[in-house]
UniProtKB/Swiss-Prot annotation:
InterPro entries according to UniProt: SurE, SurE-like_Pase/nucleotidase, SurE-like_sf
GO molecular function: 3'-nucleotidase activity; 5'-nucleotidase activity; exopolyphosphatase activity; metal ion binding; nucleotide binding
Name used for this protein in its record: 5'-nucleotidase SurE
Keyword terms: Cytoplasm, Hydrolase, Metal-binding, Nucleotide-binding
Length: 251
């Protein structure tokens, strides 16, 4: 088995090294990751400039592009032999609830799924993560399960792991995505010439975080495993939209 590993924190991030070493115990691992931190890149694909990939001294390919670029390149042309699975992470910080929309970590896994491979996104749920080894151990267990019992073709796993030693993990929970309040306002500042600049504010606090959600699992010290899908269609709204269309004049 060949596993393509990527992330959005960059090829020198601690989480990707620990993950690659752990997965190397069960598979051949190839790392293709951004050359710098690309957190929040979401599913952006570089179309206006060429991509450059360089094999580093640590054996990792670093790409001047987004996490999605890395996985796309790794599957469709960079490697002599196509991988069997994509694992993205271990992310520095959680990807809970609405975070998945912005996450380059999740997008890297989703790109693997777009291109026909099973995929997992793994995040360590702490702003000051320490226990990357715990998250890597969880990923290795899930890789084995996923190969033995594949998910539906449009599905990936979004995995969040408490920042705890392995022995303190209380459980593994199948969860749904929770939701956050709206983001905090942008932070206004000034450049050295006094011109206004803005920093994107922090994510909102959890709002929908009750039992069954990814937020709740992490708060309990459990690993949260959320199956998420490529199809963004809101099926419950189709009939309502169809009703609108019946009332829209055709001329």
């Amino acid at each position: 088995m060949r596993i393509l590993v990527s992330n959005d924190d960059g090829y020198l991030a601690p989480g990707i090294r620990v993950l690659a070493d752990c997965l190397a115990k069960i598979a051949e691992v190839i790392v293709v990751a951004p050359d710098r931190d690309r957190s929040g890149a979401s599913h952006s694909l570089t179309l206006d400039t060429p991509l450059r990939a360089t094999l580093g001294e640590n054996g990792f390919y670093r790409v001047e592009g987004t996490p999605t670029d890395c996985v796309h390149l790794g599957i469709t042309g960079l490697l002599e032999k196509e991988p069997d699975m994509v694992v993205s992470g271990v992310n520095w910080g959680a990807n809970l609830g609405d975070d998945v929309i912005y996450s380059g970590t999740v997008a890297a896994a989703m790109e693997g799924r777009f291109l026909g491979l099973p995929a997992i996104a793994v995040s360590l749920a702490s702003a000051e993560p320490e226990h990357f080894d715990t998250a890597a151990w969880v990923a290795r267990r899930l890789v084995t399960s996923l190969m033995e019992d594949p998910l539906p073709a449009d599905t990936i796993l979004n995995v969040n792991v408490p920042n705890l030693p392995r022995t303190q993990i209380t459980d593994f929970e199948a969860t749904r995505l929770g939701h956050r309040h709206r983001s905090e306002p942008v932070i206004k500042d000034a450049d050295p010439r006094g011109r206004p600049i803005y920093w994107v504010g922090p994510a909102g606090e959890s709002q929908d975080a009750g039992p069954g959600t990814d937020f709740h699992a992490i708060a309990r010290g459990s690993v949260s495993i959320t199956p998420i899908q490529v199809d963004l269609t809101r099926y419950a709204a189709l009939d309502q939209v169809a009703g609108w269309l019946q009332r829209i004049p055709r001329s």
